Amino acid sequence: MVFKVFSFVAFMACSTVKVGSIVWVQDPEEAWIDGEVVEVNGEDIKVQCTSGKTVVAKGSNTYPKDMEVPPSGVDDMTTLAYLHEPGVLQNLKSRYYIDEIYTYTGNILIAVNPFKQLPNLYNDHMMAQYKGAALGELSPHPFAVADAAYRQMINEGISQSILVSGESGAGKTETAKMLMKYLAKMGGRAVSDRRTVEDQVLESNPVLEAFGNAKTVKNNNSSRFGKFVEIQFDQRGRISGAAIRTYLLERSRVCQVSDPERNYHCFYMLCAAPPEDKRKLKLNDPTEFRYLNQSHCIKLDGVDDSKEYTKTREAMGIVGINLEEQEAIFRVVAAILHLGNIEFAIGEEPDSSVPTDESKKYLKIAAELFMCDEQALEDSLCKRIMVTPEETISRCLDPNSAALSRDALAKFVYSRLFDWIVNKINNSIGQDPDSKDMIGVLDIYGFESFKTNSFEQFCINLTNEKLQQHFTQHVLKMEQEEYTKEEIEWSQITFPDNRYVLELIEKKRGGIIALLDEACMFPRSTHKTFSQKLYETLKDNKYFSKPKLSRTDFTICHYAGDVTYQTEQFLEKNKDYVVAEHQALLGASRCTFIAGLFPPLVEDANKQSKFSSIASQFKQQLASLIEGLNTTEPHYIRCVKPNNLLKPSIFENQNSLQQLRCGGVMETIRVCRAGYPTRKHFDEFLDRFGILDSATLDKSSDEKAACKKLLETVGLNGFQIGKTKVFLKAGQMAELDDRRTEVLGRAACIIQWKFRSYLTRQSFIMLRNAAINIQAVYRGQVARYRFENLRREAAALKIQRALRIHLDRKRSYIEAVVTVQSGLRGMAARVVLRRKTKATTVIQSHCRRLRAELHYKKLKKAAITTQSAWRARLARKELRKLKTDARDTVVLQAAKSMLAEKVEELTWRLDLEKRMRVDMEVSKAQENAKLQLALEEIQLQFEETKVSLLKEVEAAKKTAAIVPVVKEVPVVDTVLMEKLTSENEKLKSLVTSLELKIDETEKKFEETKKISEERLKKALDAENKIDNLKTAMHNLEEKLKEVKLENNFLKESVLTTPVKTASGRFLSTPLKNLQNGLFTSEESQLSGAEFTTPPRIQESGSDTKSRGSHIDPQHEDVDALINSVTKNVGFSQGKPVAAFTIYKCLLHWKSFEAERTNVFDRLVQMIGSAIKDEDNDANLAYWLSNTSTLLFMLQQSLKSGGTGATPLRQSPSLVRWMTKGFRSPAAEAIRPVDAKDPALHFKQQLEAYVEKILGIIWDNLKKELNTVLALCIQAPKTFKGNALISITTANYWQDIIEGLDALLSTLKESFVPPVLIQKIFSQAFSLINVQVCNSLVTRPDNCSFINGEYLKSGLEKLEKWCCETKEEYAGSSWDELKHTRQAVGFLLIHKKYNISYDEIANDLCPNLQIQQHFKLCTLYKDEIYNTKSVSQDVIASMTGVMTDSSDFLLKEDSSNIISLSIDDLCSSMQDKDFAQVKPAEELLENPSFIFLH
């Protein structure tokens, strides 16, 4: 039936179908498949499908496929060029596979259940995005529908309603939760009540789900009742009240459960309750109860019933159900479970029944839980009392009737319990009688059609028929409103009205409900007689029919299809009678809660005969619901279940298409098609079809006139031109596309012709250039050959000339050789003389080396001796120090004496070793002196011999010069040579003897050295022992001081006047006070031949006391300081004066070393008062500079000394003595101080204030950026004659730059440390990065080429600002924009279709997540060049890599706290020199602050 709706559209499209067209054809499995037309034979069309098979279809059953639809589909299906059934189905399917589960059809939202968690779609950030956004501005979402309803209610003062429908498992309940969550967020109260209305509304969902939801075949959490939540708002738009209306609870499920379904959740939760609750209610495993074990499904995967029980109890407390009422509710639930285990057997009489022996315990437990009489409960189940005018008759029931009575009691009790819970929630939340505006959320069951359809399906489908009638009327109204808004001419649209089906069901006389009520009033009526009555009465109604193979079923032709109902249970389920015995039994219960569930009937005996049925009550409720909806402005959400497997990423075409038909979506499309189904904005229309008449576009600058002229030029009739859109009849879009295809085809032919001509000409030019090049190469080769011959002739002449020259030179060389030989013979004689002279030089070098070695060994020995003497001196000094420090020790005198004896013994041993070592050194010195004398004598003889030899050599030289040289026969003075030779031999023997003596001396020296090293080692061991004794002595002194301090404390507590001992003060005096007695100059340390122990200056008790005490400042001084620094005292040498002044005063007053002082508290209060004005950035920057500088000085000077801590006594080193007294002025300005707890606490408070001021400044900048960022994200658009979009340069990015410059100038004027400025700007750029990047992956309009160019220009301005600001203040701010820079870079790439996934993930956008890649690729669009996004293979690769996590948004730091590292602060201020900083001038005039001068 629905296929015929589009037949006329398909017929019009068929006339334009040609070979090569891409069309949709019907398929029995996939519903619709696409393919290419390969043959057209009249009405028959042969299509080659993409699946591989060939199909022959009628033209009336084919639809054109829009090839320009993006791979990710469109947000609003009314913008599809071809609005037909396969196009709608394909759009939903393509969006579903990329997790875009929401799609608009006009103002109707279609939600496809993803069957997986998508938490990123419903967080607070998404709520903030949709707040105040127009419908359609952002991606489709339930938040957008809720926001539109809320805004319309506030602006127009009209109540709204949101209707959520769909079949079981489609996600209606979750969607309704999201709607109420958003409305509660929008209408939440500012004050924090104990239980706000919005909290109670939200927490009512888990309570109602526990008692009204169950697992069905299609859904694990199916609502078995309808729910309409009315949320009331006051005049300010805040929630002021709420009410919950429920419809048609499925009572039969309490007693009958099909496999693999479950009963209501509350039963299983109670069986999983804590042991004490189960023991109290006598519950065991759920498989032991008949009402639960009818199905094998007891537990749900991923659901912990024990945790759900706890959550339900908490939710019940929030909605106003106290603990006592909760206990009573679950007592009733447990009683129903025990009641179901009661079984009956035949009693003493044939038609009587009694409980079986096994069931009596359950009867007893049920009576205890109901708090009624056990026998009365048994009689109410097994007997009936009939009252006649004459007498009262008691009639027994057979076992079957007793079982039915038991089930009726269970259903009756559960129904009353559910109604009580709903009323309790309503009473607890409360309704606002003064409220005029409300938003209703209807969570209602969708159209149902199963193999077996009973009374519940009949009522559900009746509800959907009524809602469909309301829905169709509203859709038609919206369609006509748009026509009126666009001011086009239109005629009345005819649409199918299902009022005839409603009359069939609801007609007062002869309707199905009327006939059903009539049958229920007669006791002897059965479902067969009821069915026969239906056949006789409604046989002529075309919407009613009787199945051929059934005698009791009937079929109704609903708007969504034919449904066959089985009448077997209709009569029983329609009866709403109350058994008097049950009413009396439970009304008399001793439990006030249970008795309250069954109040006595107020009707008299005459009114009891009036019949009331479930169908009639439901009909009245439904009429009341529709009447309430008619007074509101409706909004529709249609939920679709994509598959029956309840698994993600599976989209079943047939199943989804049937739900779209049942949900009225296809009917909406048919109503739209009855008028003008295709509507395009002027710019979109001109972008697509402007090529049909480009001349008209060039002449016209008016979009409307251009569209009209274009349509008239192509000869299209029946169109309408509105104010902003072009309206086309069905089939006209296909005709325009055919014209456009023809124009593109002709243009392609021209382009090919031009291109082929270009290729041919290029080939000719290439051949001509090649011929010219070949000729040139040949001519060059001939010329080179000729040149080579000429070069060879010239070379031959040169060779001949060179040969003649060579022969002449050879002759001259022979003559020169003879001359050289004569000179060489003379040279040989001179070489012999030089060799002897060299030997003499070697001997001299050996002697000099020997002297140097002896000198080195002498120095080494002296150094060892000096070191030994120095270590002994230090040991003796430490011994004297220990003796002096232990002089006043009385209690530990014995220990000291024993230690002193050990020290003396070790000292004696050390002195003995030293004396032995000195004796050895003396003997070695004497022996070395003898050897030295011998060596000097030998050297003296050697010198004399050398002098004589030199004289003889000189004489020989003179003689040689006088006597002429005989050629080739040298004359040698043999006598002189023999003399020299003998002298040389003597010298050699002398040197040999000296070397032997030196070797012996070295051996003795090595033995002496070993002995000395052993003795030195023993001396070091002795020193270690002395150090250990010194440490032990120090520990004893510490214990002694603790004892003395305790004694002093006890004396002070007893005596009125405190007594302070000088010794205690002396012992607690820091060691640094004694350093003044050490060396003060380098001369005093190095004077004299020996090192002497420095004198020790003992201080008197009064001096020590004055140095260690804290100078308490007068209150007037503190007030003067605070009054002075509270004002802006400015800066000196680029440093804050206030911070330096405070530090100097605290240092002088010794407040850092005080155990108790209130100065720090006064300063903290002063800083807190100074920064109260959070909007004044200049004041905040001034105090940020002061607090950070003061924190730096405290960090540099304060040391955690603790209370009563004693510095570790160390042996003073030579370096410390030498450097004592030499300090720079900067070191005097900031010097180390042993801080106490108040000072350390003040330092922590100061650090907190620095972070607080940083946070306030960042918060001010954040507010300023947020106001401008929303305008910077999307490029403004304008239209020009050629329908291209151009960018108008806006100043929004410049506003950001100016704001950053202003803040930077303020911070620099206050000399704020650069590291703090870097942190502020890093946070600012991080905010820009998060906002812009998130907008690109959430808003389709922003993810475009034109917007990428706009954002690129803004990023260039920010980069220029960072470069001008320099790294000192900007830091790594530019790196914070890495996500945005990569995303914008991707948008500006032209050939995205050729990019692979690896290039995107590794090269283009390495810092973006896979979900963000996916969003950018699917949302991208190009309005200028119409370039495509990435290929489907890349999309498929991303889909395969993506995990279940859908978190594609960057996280924004919502806190305003900027963490501070003191180390970073100190490193940035290491070059601070405070020596030249001037204190506050106002204090310089005060005599109390004379120390500041």
UniProtKB/Swiss-Prot annotation:
Residues 18-67 form the Myosin N-terminal SH3-like domain. Residues 1161-1444 form the Dilute domain. Residues 889-1057 form a coiled coil. The keyword Coiled coil applies. The keyword Coiled coil applies. One of its GO terms (molecular function) is calmodulin binding. GO terms for biological process: actin filament organization; actin filament-based movement. Residues 1085-1114 are annotated as: Disordered. Residues 72-741 form the Myosin motor domain. Belongs to the TRAFAC class myosin-kinesin ATPase superfamily. Myosin family. Plant myosin class XI subfamily. This is Myosin-13. The gene is XI-G.
